[in-house]
Amino acid sequence: MADEIAKAQVARPGGDTIFGKIIRKEIPAKIIFEDDRCLAFHDISPQAPTHFLVIPKKHISQISVAEDDNESLLGHLMIVGKKCAADLGLNKGYRMVVNEGSDGGQSVYHVHLHVLGGRQMHWPPG
């Protein structure tokens, strides 16, 4: 976890990201779901027995810069996350998280929804 915090503290918005490369299929990912608006794939550094990301294909660097016309797309990410969680057997519950900015732990500046499950989640989370 400390490694992710360190990455978040030095990450900055702008430019291409690893998620752009995954969307363009330039680098591999364990894809769970894909449609014309988003992509869901397993996290390469899972923080729970099941941990996947749902990302929009349209680049939006942060929730804080999302526009009103992104509302449907951002809602779609949550619906896809719910469906993928069900497909992966997370029937006892799961957590959805969006990290915003360096203090929020955002290490990749392309909006992404974390879905974590397969164990009891604790509160507070961080």
From Swiss-Prot:
Keywords: Acetylation, Apoptosis, Cytoplasm, Hydrolase, Nucleotide-binding, Nucleus, Phosphoprotein, Protease, Thiol protease, Transcription, Transcription regulation, Ubl conjugation pathway
Sites where the protein binds AMP: 43-44, 99, 105-107, 112-114
GO molecular function: adenosine 5'-monophosphoramidase activity; deSUMOylase activity; hydrolase activity; nucleotide binding
Motif (Histidine triad motif): 110-114
Chief location: cytoplasm
InterPro entries for this protein: Histidine_triad_CS, Histidine_triad_HIT, HIT-like, HIT-like_sf
Gene Ontology cellular component annotations, sorted alphabetically: cytoplasm; histone deacetylase complex; nucleus
Superkingdom of origin organism: Eukaryota
Residue numbers carrying N-acetylalanine: 2
Enzyme class label: hydrolase
Subcellular location: Cytoplasm; Nucleus
Catalytic activity, EC: 3.9.1.-, 3.4.22.-
Chain positions found as Phosphoserine: 45, 72
Pfam families in the cross-refs: HIT
Domain HIT: 18-126
The keyword Ligase is annotated on this UniProt entry: no
Function field: Exhibits adenosine 5'-monophosphoramidase activity, hydrolyzing purine nucleotide phosphoramidates with a single phosphate group such as adenosine 5'monophosphoramidate (AMP-NH2) to yield AMP and NH2. Hydrolyzes adenosine 5'monophosphomorpholidate (AMP-morpholidate) and guanosine 5'monophosphomorpholidate (GMP-morpholidate). Hydrolyzes lysyl-AMP (AMP-N-epsilon-(N-alpha-acetyl lysine methyl ester)) generated by lysine tRNA ligase, as well as Met-AMP, His-AMP and Asp-AMP, lysyl-GMP (GMP-N-epsilon-(N-alpha-acetyl lysine methyl ester)) and AMP-N-alanine methyl ester.
Subunit comment: Homodimer. Interacts with CDK7. Interacts with RUVBL1 and RUVBL2 and is associated with the LEF1/TCF1-CTNNB1 complex and with a KAT5 histone acetyltransferase complex. Identified in a complex with MITF and CTNNB1. Interacts with CDC34 and RBX1, and is part of a SCF (SKP2-CUL1-F-box protein) E3 ubiquitin-protein ligase complex. Interacts with SUMO1, SUMO2 and RGS17. Interacts with the Ten-1 ICD form of TENM1. Interacts with CALM1; interaction increases in the presence of calcium ions.
Protein name (record): Adenosine 5'-monophosphoramidase HINT1
Originating species: Pongo abelii
Chain's gene name: HINT1
